[in-house]
Amino acid sequence: MPRILAATAGSFVLKAYFHRWRSLVILALLLAPLLWPLQYFAERYYSEQLAEQNRQTLDLYVANLLGTLRRYEELPQILGGLPVLRQALQQPGDPLLQKIANEALADIRRRTGADVIYLLQPDGTTQVASNWAQADSFVHRNFAFRPYYREAMQGRLARFFGLGTTSIKRGYYFASAVKEGSRIIGVLVVKVDLEHIERLWGNSPEQLLVIDNYGVVILSSREDWRFHASRPLSAAERDEIHANIPYPVQDPKPLRLQQSAWLSQSRTLPETGWTVSIYAPRTLIERPVRSVLLIGGATLLALLLLLTLLTLSRRHYLDRIALEAEAKRQLEERVLERTRELENANAQLQQEVHEREQAQRELMRAQDEVVQAGKLTALGTMSASISHELNQPLAAIRSYADNARVLLDHQRTEDARGNLEQISDLTTRMASIIAHLKAYARGARRAPENVQLQPAIEDALSMVASRRRAMNVELLRDVPDAPLWVQAGETRLRQILGNLLTNALDALAEKAPPRRLWVIASQDQHGVTLTLRDNGPGFSEDALAHAHEPFFTTKTTAKGLGLGLAICDNLLRALGGRLEMGNHLEGGAVVRLHLLPGVPGVAAMPQEETRA
């Protein structure tokens, strides 16, 4: 009898356990579909995060690419005015002159970092080139078939990307006509090597590519994508490719990409007609999504196990409740203790999740700030600022040279000698400006010096005097006769004043006469204030809000890069001063320079000039 009861009880227990586990399996199957919305939202979240990251990366690389191109954009026009190059075109039979021109281009190429600089005759034959002494010299080679030659001969600034037929190297070409009056006497070409940008792209996990106006990949972080067509080419496009030879292949093969495997973003560059795209593999999304699914599955499993434990505990409690009350009390205490542990663990987990999310937000914000600071630093130290800073002394040199020519025609040699001395002083000043800008790019800091303000004002006014008189601008000065000593540097102070006076004349050029320019200096217990005012159109609200930012300008690209006020602001800050801008109540712009007071009668050695 006891054996029968025991067997019956055992069979009952087995059926009960089987029933419980079957219920748990059914519950698990019902909860499993909850992982699908978890996967959907996880993919959406990480896709948005990756898209934002790709956008920032694309902005950074686009800024780098445009910065590289803009660095050389105006170089052909500037070099086209060099007398030695003009003489080389006018006297092609003079071997000594040709050698001097070749060496001049080679030196300019080394200093600017360009790949090749060469000068074409009107028929497209290379007269002089920076690589004249190399095996792949361009001298005596004809490039009349190139589109940049044809566009430059039409008087336009030409752009072209293609494969060099002589060097077999890819490059971006800028070309500009060299004119003698209205007659085109040649074409100056600057070739820029962009392969270093590809090498920079190769260090990132994303894949970047640049597509030209034909739809062909010309730059890419993957070599097997280069010179493949991203879309079908028309017959006319194929004919142009055969005629211009922009690629090492005459018939680009289609670029076969499995779009579903990539997350892409693109940016069009109107200046070049290119499209820059970034491709990130979707595996960057799949990995964190799998982690989320694993965590979600583990959470569901933990819930099932918890339900199992609770069910078994409850069943055990119900089975034994009739046998002993003490066991009931102990079981209740155990369940309560376990519940408290789970609650504590859950609270701790929530706290850790909150801290992790907060740390992630802080990290992303810090990364955004670092990226923005890196872009401003890279853009602020580009050598484009050199051409901007040299515009004023170059314009003054041209004016003095034109006046000297007229004076010599009238046999006024003493006056002409004075102009030549002014030109010599300006070239010394240009060398000092270049030395200072190099130190500025390296982040060097020199202590301010005790200098007089009046000589710097006179120098800056003399640099723009010819243009001011030509524009019929009335100069109104209110500067004390007693020396005003400030803490500055002579070169830096002249740079700042020259930039601001040039900006004032640019603004007055947009206004009909009468034109007036005020220069006012005053001193108080806080320092020296120099005020420059004009009766031009004044600053707009947008200009006042962004004037201190690099590359912000209301001028066209040919008239300015937007670096002048940013450079003046940085120089003044380095001197302990500040720059204020506003509009006068009677109309026109007002710019105030606040400078720290210097020690009267104590002039330090001009470190900027001596070290230049």
Curated annotation (Swiss-Prot):
It is a multi-pass membrane protein. It catalyses: ATP + protein L-histidine = ADP + protein N-phospho-L-histidine. It comes from the Bacteria. It is found in: Cell inner membrane. SMART domains: HATPase_c, HisKA. Residues 385-599 form the Histidine kinase domain. GO terms for molecular function: ATP binding; phosphorelay sensor kinase activity. It is an enzyme of class 2 (transferase). Keywords: ATP-binding, Cell inner membrane, Cell membrane, Coiled coil, Kinase, Membrane, Nucleotide-binding, Phosphoprotein, Transferase, Transmembrane, Transmembrane helix, Two-component regulatory system. Its EC number is 2.7.13.3. Residues 328-376 form a coiled coil. The keyword Cell inner membrane applies. Autophosphorylated. The modification Phosphohistidine is found at H388. GO terms for biological process: positive regulation of organic acid transport. GO terms for cellular component: plasma membrane. PANTHER family: C4-DICARBOXYLATE TRANSPORT SENSOR PROTEIN DCTB, SENSOR HISTIDINE KINASE. This is C4-dicarboxylate transport sensor protein DctB. It comes from Pseudomonas aeruginosa (strain ATCC 15692 / DSM 22644 / CIP 104116 / JCM 14847 / LMG 12228 / 1C / PRS 101 / PAO1). The lineage of its organism: Bacteria, Pseudomonadati, Pseudomonadota, Gammaproteobacteria, Pseudomonadales. The gene is dctB.
